[in-house]
Regions:
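Short loop/turn motifs that connect adjacent beta-strands in outer-membrane beta-barrel proteins
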Residues: 20-23, 36-44, 89, 131-140, ...
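Outer-envelope beta-barrel architecture signal
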Residues: 41-47, 88-90, 137-141, 186, ...
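Residues that define the transmembrane beta-barrel architecture of outer-membrane proteins
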Residues: 43, 72-78, 115-123, 139, ...
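Transmembrane beta-barrel strands of outer-membrane/channel proteins
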Residues: 47-55, 94-98, 143-149, 205-209, ...
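Residue-level signature of outer-membrane beta-barrel architecture
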Residues: 51-53, 84, 96, 127-129, ...
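Surface-exposed strand-loop-strand hairpins of Gram-negative outer-membrane beta-barrel proteins
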Residues: 52-77
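Outer membrane beta-barrel transmembrane domains
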Residues: 58-60, 66, 217-340
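Outer-membrane pore/translocation modules
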Residues: 111-206, 213, 266, 270, ...
């Protein structure tokens, strides 16, 4: 039942695609909770939806606790996706998400900076390079190349001052609360899977690299890289447990020539970028082709450049359903028989 781990990976891409991790211009680590995914059967479709909650009031200077810069950062996010097996080796996915809120609460809860709206549209084709079963052990290797296109706003503003003489004065909100980073990004992905059928144990790993582009404000968020190592096992037929150790790296934000990130957008470049390690348990309930799951991300190690809000609480839950769009065909010498 490999598909119990196939869907959290996409919400990981969608939310972490805008993560930068700086005190004035990042999203902490909302991507956390990645899971591996290979390909579907030919003519098989998968639909899934997930809800994700993120909260953090932890702040770090490098790897040390430090004083809070604001009260907390939190978000509520829903993510939906469709996959289709074009051939037995090639699967195409499309996904998008919506933030009900991304909020930065100031100290003493005196003020709130927040936004909501659509995040990114993700196109994610994957190709199975190797897939064989021998002695009840199945081995699979998959590569993917994806594209992330922003749908929501990356330049929402906040009212700073209102005066009868000069009117309203607005400032662009920090990237921590923007629904998207506003750039077109490329994604490079690999997946290795080994299934020990008799023991109902699965070992697998994935690697992801996101190459950022520049947005319309002249900002280029740091590239993102991660690698995950997984162990999964099915219990009592319908219950599955998967554990993951994930390491991630986020590069520093950059700007086009002539753009002053501090003066224009209050972003301190020295406080962007991070290295983190997470432990991610996941539990799933399987009913035929329908799966319900819940997962959480537990930070084990965090090192941030400068001073930033860190990762603290991230919980994801959702469902996944697979079905055949067309009945499989049995080929004979003279004609094809469609199985109903």
């Amino acid at each position: 039942m490999r598909h119990i781990t196939s869907f959290v990976f996409f919400i990981f891409i969608a939310t972490n695609s805008s993560a930068q991790g700086c005190c004035s211009g990042g999203a902490g680590s909302p991507i956390a909770g990645g899971a591996a995914t290979g390909v579907l059967q030919k003519n098989q479709m998968q639909v899934s939806a997930n809800y994700q909650y993120i909260f953090s009031n932890k702040f770090y200077t490098e790897n040390r606790d430090t004083n809070a810069l604001f009260d907390n950062l939190n978000s509520n996010y829903i993510f939906y996706r469709m996959d289709y097996g074009v051939t037995k080796k090639f699967t195409f996915s499309i996904a998008a998400g919506y933030f009900f809120n991304k909020s930065l609460i100031e100290l003493n809860q005196t003020d709130t900076i927040h936004s909501k709206g659509m995040g990114d549209l993700i196109f994610f084709p994957r190709y199975d390079l190797y897939n064989k079963t021998k002695n009840n052990i199945r081995t699979e290797f998959t590569l993917g190349l994806g594209l992330k296109i922003p749908l929501g706003s990356h330049n929402d503003s906040t009212l700073m001052l209102s005066h009868p003489s000069i009117g309203d004065i607005y400032a662009i909100s920090p990237p921590t609360v923007q629904p998207t980073n506003g750039s077109n990004d490329l994604m490079f992905y690999s997946f290795f899977f080994r299934d020990y059928t008799i023991n109902k144990i699965r070992l697998f790993s994935n690697a992801l690299y996101i190459k950022r582009g520049y947005n319309s404000l002249g900002e280029k968020f740091g590239d993102y890289a991660s690698i995950g190592l997984f162990v999964g096992k099915t219990f009592i037929r319908k219950w599955g447990v998967t554990t993951q150790i994930k390491g991630e790296w986020i590069g520093e934000i950059k700007a086009k020539e002539g753009i002053d990130l501090v003066a224009d957008y209050n972003i301190d470049i020295a406080s962007t970028g991070s290295k983190k390690i997470f432990f991610i348990p996941q539990i799933s309930y399987i009913k035929k082709s329908f799966v319900v799951f819940a997962t959480c991300e537990i930070p084990l190690y965090q090192y941030v450049n400068g001073t930033q809000v860190g990762s603290q609480i991230q919980i994801t839950s959702g469902f996944n359903y697979r079905f055949m769009v067309k009945s499989p065909e049995i080929k004979t010498d003279d004609y094809d028989i469609q199985v109903n």
